[in-house]
Curated annotation (Swiss-Prot):
Pathway: Amine and polyamine biosynthesis; ectoine biosynthesis; L-ectoine from L-aspartate 4-semialdehyde: step 2/3. Its EC number is 2.3.1.178. This is L-2,4-diaminobutyric acid acetyltransferase. The keyword Phosphoprotein does not apply.
């Protein structure tokens, strides 16, 4: 058996949306937390924070490793004393690259109530807005008022509109799961101080 070289036809290059540049070194502090891009070493702690939240669907530890490696431009980690204590992970929607979808946001119990979750989302939006992103989307189940309040606070601080519509009914999930509503914040211009 011999290997065959495959040739590809010559075609005009397709202009694709530019991905958000990954390793951004600009860090901010909120209280004692440093907000920064993720590192592979953060994945295990991010997985634990998600698992301990008891609200998020916990993905495999492998998924968080990939997230830290492949999506550093749309992920922000909160660090205190060298340890991850919170995170927001998201991605640019392929069908709508001007929209960042927030997949998960969580903060360890020791950091809750300090505005860390809101600061993580604000940092993410500040990071992606210069790249043409104008909207944020996320899904939240109706039984999670803390998340709803957090995203409402982000919208207020940005002077943006927060809209809600049903997205996934409980019946579409293969397991027992609450329905998920789609929340959208737009426009996500710079934070109003």
């Amino acid at each position: 058996m011999s290997l065959q070289t495959l040739s590809t036809p010559t075609a005009e290059p397709v202009e694709e949306p530019r991905p958000v540049e990954a390793p951004w070194q600009v860090s901010d502090r909120i209280g004692t937390a440093l907000l920064r891009a993720p590192q592979l070493g953060d994945a295990a702690e991010i997985w634990r924070i998600a698992k301990d939240s008891r609200v998020l669907d916990t993905n495999s530890s492998y998924a968080y490793l990939l997230w830290c490696r492949d999506f550093p431009g749309t992920t922000v980690v909160a660090e205190v004393d060298g340890r991850a204590v919170g995170f927001v992970i998201g991605y640019l929607r392929p069908e709508s690259p001007d929209t960042v979808f927030v997949w998960q946001v969580a903060v360890s119990p020791t950091e809750r109530g300090r505005g860390t979750g809101t600061a993580l989302i604000q940092k993410l939006l500040d990071r992606v807005a210069p790249h043409g992103v104008t909207a944020l989307e996320t899904t939240i189940s109706p039984d999670n008022p803390a998340s709803i309040a957090m995203f409402a606070a982000v919208a207020r601080r940005r002077g943006a509109q927060l809209t809600k519509q049903p997205l996934f009914d409980a019946g579409v999930f293969p397991d027992e799961h609450a329905p998920e509503d789609l929340y959208r914040i737009a426009p996500i211009a710079q934070e109003i101080r």
